[in-house]
Amino acid sequence: MQRLMMLLATSGACLGLLAVAAVAAAGANPAQRDTHSLLPTHRRQKRDWIWNQMHIDEEKNTSLPHHVGKIKSSVSRKNAKYLLKGEYVGKVFRVDAETGDVFAIERLDRENISEYHLTAVIVDKDTGENLETPSSFTIKVHDVNDNWPVFTHRLFNASVPESSAVGTSVISVTAVDADDPTVGDHASVMYQILKGKEYFAIDNSGRIITITKSLDREKQARYEIVVEARDAQGLRGDSGTATVLVTLQDINDNFPFFTQTKYTFVVPEDTRVGTSVGSLFVEDPDEPQNRMTKYSILRGDYQDAFTIETNPAHNEGIIKPMKPLDYEYIQQYSFIVEATDPTIDLRYMSPPAGNRAQVIINITDVDEPPIFQQPFYHFQLKENQKKPLIGTVLAMDPDAARHSIGYSIRRTSDKGQFFRVTKKGDIYNEKELDREVYPWYNLTVEAKELDSTGTPTGKESIVQVHIEVLDENDNAPEFAKPYQPKVCENAVHGQLVLQISAIDKDITPRNVKFKFILNTENNFTLTDNHDNTANITVKYGQFDREHTKVHFLPVVISDNGMPSRTGTSTLTVAVCKCNEQGEFTFCEDMAAQVGVSIQAVVAILLCILTITVITLLIFLRRRLRKQARAHGKSVPEIHEQLVTYDEEGGGEMDTTSYDVSVLNSVRRGGAKPPRPALDARPSLYAQVQKPPRHAPGAHGGPGEMAAMIEVKKDEADHDGDGPPYDTLHIYGYEGSESIAESLSSLGTDSSDSDVDYDFLNDWGPRFKMLAELYGSDPREELLY
């Protein structure tokens, strides 16, 4: 078999060499080949071009121009001229017009343009007419291996999990060779790692893989790989290398360990359950997202006393009490804690020795408030009992001092004023309780810590006390609702008037039975239905409205409680007129049906009369006091309250009070003593020497009044012991040239001097003041 295979390979090689030789021979003289292939036969052929494409190698090293090929027709003419048309004519190619030879006038690069499409034209030199139809042809540029591979990026970034298995793909890089991939190995690329080959390898496809499983992010987080690309002939250049940066992805492959072996905390005993009392810190080389530390208490008797929660933000362990701390019970807690990571497979890794630590928690004493023995109290009490012991609450001081405790009921409690609590915590009711009024009472009892003197220390606790009032059969049955029965005056025997039912304010059991009895003899019959209802029917029939319009039926209702209670409820039955169909046509008004009692009417009238008498007494008392004050005033006091209405200005200043004793003394000539003042000394104006009186026939004028005022003013100004007199009033002069003249009562010397006012004395005591004011001649009584 081996010999057969070798024979076949040798035969194939020989055939290949023969084919290459044939191609070379054909290409050595293409023009000649074309010419021979297109020689005319015995029959006449149409003239036509004898070529279709040309070939040339890129980047020839010979001098320009480079001969590409030759264009010619099957029929030669001496006056023929060859032309080229196309985009690259004159720039890249030209043609010899006489011979048809095509030349490249610049070096060609296949990587830029691999084919050129031109048009060949043959024309007559003289006329310029086309001798042949223009023909398009192609010039193909043959590739040579003149380019080296170039990476698509100079820098690649990749990542791979740490501790990955050997052969794990990291990244694929690509380098591109611009040469023709169809020609030999011109475009084939080969890769190799120049830097980082200790940890990574690359295959010919550009895929980089790991060759070791000892990649540890905690030791080295990044790796730099330099990759080289070259073609099959070994062409390399500056662009033939690239850098790959490989970042190791962290995995949770490290156990946490404590930063110290012993933690000590001091915690007050009043620390609330669930609050932090301390924190435990560990180190974990992994990245934060892979730090999943779990803390647990290993040894000790206090596993149920504390819990350790993990704070994800800082990976710390927060110690929290699970039940209240009590210094009087335990002063110190000591236990061992362990920090582990449950996501790490313990089959491949074992935790380090530093993942355990000792925790010591010292409890400090705090003055705590009293503690009740129960979270709440529930007591029961029968209603209508007179101040029995309801129950006892008890609180104790949890501290070692064991202070005494005082109790009180908060006044904000529900009806707390009905109860009291003693120093021992006994609760009593202050009044009888009625379940039908309040079936439940909710009290808040305070327990206050007292010092040796009995003064509260400020520490207090409260507890809720629920008092349930138990029912007794202390209420008689009554109608279930108000009834307003009616009956026709022509009602017949046995006619149903009303069905009644009863209720009881007490708690009624399911077997409660009410018994109904009609207690009086009348025209009605009561029939007990034995289902807690009863029927009222007409006994004889035919009522007389003229005699009785309303009938009162006292119904006695009793229950079967222990003891039994009996009550009487009255039905007010109105006798109405009815038509033939038995429909009510006229009944008495509601007031008559209800039948307001005489006692109620008398009570209402007495209330109205009492209110009226009280109102009259108040009015008369105020009036008598007003009259007493009016009659008890002296003449100067009356003068002090007189208001003059002929002043044209001043507003309310006209009613300013002033001491009129001075004017009175002037008017009386000093004979009448002035009104006593608080000061024993007489008024300043009473001490002033008065001007001499005028003759009886003389008349005082404004000038004399002004002179007197000036004298008084000077004396007041020079009197250092007297109070200032800042307000001066002139009443005798009210202006000049007034048509109505003066209306003032003080200026009557010129208007009513001849009027006799003695008749005022005959008008009685009500005009006594006017008689004193006007009963004498003003010119003799007053001095202006």
Swiss-Prot record:
Glycosylation (residues): N61, N112, N157, N362, N442, N523, N535
One BP annotation, GO: intracellular calcium ion homeostasis
Transmembrane parts of this sequence: 600-620
Keywords: Calcium, Cell adhesion, Cell junction, Cell membrane, Cleavage on pair of basic residues, Cytoplasm, Glycoprotein, Membrane, Metal-binding, Phosphoprotein, Repeat, Signal, Transmembrane, Transmembrane helix
Source organism per UniProt: Homo sapiens (Human)
Domain Cadherin: from-to ranges: 48-151, 152-258, 259-372, 373-477, 478-593
UniProt: Ca(2+) 2 binding residues: E58, E111, D143, V144, D146, D179
Top-level taxon of origin: Eukaryota
Tissue and organ expression note: Expressed in endothelial cells (at protein level). Expressed in the brain.
Predominant subcellular localization, coarse grouping: other
Amino-acid positions noted as binding Ca(2+) 1 in the UniProt annotation, renumbered to this chain: E58, E59, D109, E111, D146
Topology class, membrane: Single-pass type I membrane protein
The keyword Cytoplasm appears for this protein: yes
Residue ranges of the region described as Required for interaction with PALS1: 621-660
Name recorded for this polypeptide: Cadherin-5
